[in-house]
Amino acid sequence: MKIVKTSLIAACLGAFALCGAEPYLHFPLNEGDVSKIKEATGKVAKVTVWNSKQFDVVDGPDGKAFNFNTPDQCKTYAGVSFNMPPAFDPTKGFTFTALVKMPENMHRSRQYQLFFWSNSHQQGPGIRIYVSWKSFYVLLGDGSKKPLLLTSKNSQGTLKDNTFYRLAASYDGETLKIYIDGVLRGTAKGVMKKSTRKWAAIGASSQSGSAYGFNGIISDVKIFDKALSDTEIAEMKPEK
């Protein structure tokens, strides 16, 4: 058991040892082969790859990365789903972070789904993280018609086409914060409830049908079971 636990910790820590924070879950998404995604993360959570033919292997920030190829008007979605450990409780605090490269000719009004663990797209309960109108959005729902929605929608928070960003969101049970390349871009106070959905997904909210998918690169996804500090998140910004 000690050997297994040690290997899991090493796999999860990865490049994060510098700031000392240990991810609860880590999806490198730099394996260069879709079939190896499960090998890299399967010991931590049961992983399923959605529509594997819609993944393109491209050069990424750390080895080969995956381009989630879900063009406009597409009805099947490239994604990576996994069973969220029952003990994980985002209402007590969490941080989500990922290296993201938006596509060329980003459609302004389209919703590019980064992370989905929610009972619904609009009210929750749960977490929904996406890009739309060239801005970073985080929605925390409690099941009511007034979810906590925070966006970077201003001149400084605009995301450019074909550009890598380190996007991050943290919540301490009261305050939600969003960051772009380590810089705080918005705060809001509110409450959320934990989703009752057993699985969460990266890159899409469903395999097919009426859903939202990502088009571009998602890499180095880390989920923490606490709200990281501004300093810890600033240390994560990608090298330009």
Describe every region a protein language model picked out:
Residues 18-74, 85-86, 233-240:
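Extracytoplasmic low-complexity segments
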Residues 188-217:
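Flexible glycan-contacting loops in extracellular carbohydrate-active proteins
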Residues 139-166:
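Short, aromatic/His-centered strand-loop micro-motif at the edge of beta-sheets
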Residues 69-94, 118, 150-158:
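Short surface loop/edge beta-strand patches of beta-sandwich-type extracellular domains
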Residues 163-177:
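Localized edge beta-strand/strand-to-loop motifs within extracellular or lumenal beta-rich domains
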Residues 112-140:
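Glycan-recognition/cleft segments
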Residues 24-33, 95-104, 212-239:
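Extracellular, beta-strand-rich glycan-interacting domains
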Residues 22, 86-104, 124-128, 163, ...:
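A carbohydrate-recognition surface predominantly in extracellular/luminal proteins
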